[in-house]
């Protein structure tokens, strides 16, 4: 089976009042079926823009070049997301690729029940009866770990905790059985215990649902727990790619080494902080002496 998505020499430029800004420059990536690829980098590195391009979720001010070849869920055909029509893009969303957003509270509509919002995706891609849609919504809520789904399907977003809301958002992404799920910082707004549960659910998206996952994050600890392969972005460019074991054991780029050094290690936090403070003090003293 071919790659779920193949990004070839992607460039994204935004027109701003201060001039053109190159947010993504010459990025090439592939994701195999059933693979979890983590795209990491600091804020502003271009990782989220790269991911949103796969779903055609860029603003009108964006100008793109290159190609983003998205495979259909059968793996038998592919389309270039950058050149297809709006109708074709709409058909691909949800069915071939779906997105899990960073903030579940803003991703969910507060005036509709979660069941209605799950069924909305089904209705957008074909005729489905009210009874059938409700049954599918209950089933997917159960599969993502929402307790008492027969009752909770009629609840509104404000009646769920933050972690449960993220589970609902993941359920919405999974209901049409897409081949690829793009998760943009899916654990940032959650406490550490709930983060672990959501990461386990994303792993199940691959193991039980058969979906490939692109995980956008700056948290290298999350990468170590979940990813099969890692792509490192810095200042709009892809600077390093490797399987997760190789990247953590022998990173090639200095930027990657700095990212890995930012991961807190039990027992080393205080010593590292003291050492950094000492380095800053010596630097200030040297600067004062020169002055």
Question: Where are these predicted regions, by residue range?
Answer:
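A short, surface-exposed alpha-helical micro-motif characterized by mixed small hydrophobic
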Residues: 223-225
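ABC ATPase NBD coupling module
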Residues: 75-98, 116, 124, 246-251
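Short catalytic/signature loops enriched in Gly
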Residues: 3, 20, 78, 147-151, ...
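Conserved ABC ATPase "signature" region
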Residues: 132-151, 261
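Helical segment within the ABC ATPase nucleotide-binding domain
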Residues: 196-209, 221
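A short, proline-enriched helix->beta-strand linker immediately N-terminal to the Walker B motif
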Residues: 175-179
